[in-house]
Amino acid sequence: MKYRTCLTTLLYSFLLGLILPASAQNSLQHQKDSLRYALEHAEGIDKLQIYNKLYYIYMAEAGDDQKMDTLMTLFEQAEAEAIRQGDTQMQGMVYGNRIISYINRSEHDKVIEKAPAYLDFYIRHDLWKFYYQIHMQLITAYNLKGDYELAAAEAGKMYTRARERKDKAGMATALYATGIIYNLQRRPKEEEDCFRESISLLWEVSGYDNILTQSYAFLCVSLRAQARYDELLQLVPNMKKPSPASRKPPAGCSPKLGEIFMWH
């Protein structure tokens, strides 16, 4: 499993949905028109939620330059409305989705330019789940440009902040990011150590199933690279255990208000 290939597949899988039959295109346009009409009459949090739904639709079409331009305009409008209402959570979500849109289009320099200010915003307003998600995207941008030293420096910052807060999910995310850097550098033993520690922490929290699943996948890759096949097979029973999220409800906000839109 090559990280770059897998990551590219994840980031661009949404493009498969761009070639749609006319009926589907008409349905999307109808949704857009309905949401734009609703925007004219909405107020308060309802208006922010409508912006949220509308730009989600355009994010799925961001491979088209014209749709990307429209999406950026929507982000600007949603940001202005969130600032007007004093809703820092929705403002932070706009910033995060803007970064995801740049990543999905391989605009890595844009991510590197914009992300640091957004990370500062998340820190000031205690939006830590957003912070970890978008710090991961900054690290991803450096990785995809081959700037592994800068990627490692950012992962180190993430881990330090999480450790200071005794935030196990944040520490696990930073270790996951570091493990990916070692994978790209073909350092399987260090990669293994990072993913083992990340997995150990993730089993103590909920709401991070995607990172937990991918950590197991990368751990298998690192063991295979070291020809430790018996240990690889021993991982299977652990991977079949119920996830942390199935043992207790995830912490945090509802999907509408608390999650950055991520392509999987």
Give the positions of each predicted feature.
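Bacterial N-terminal signal peptides that target proteins for export
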Residues: 1-11
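Bacterial N-terminal signal peptides
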Residues: 9-21
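A "functional boundary" signal
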Residues: 23-264
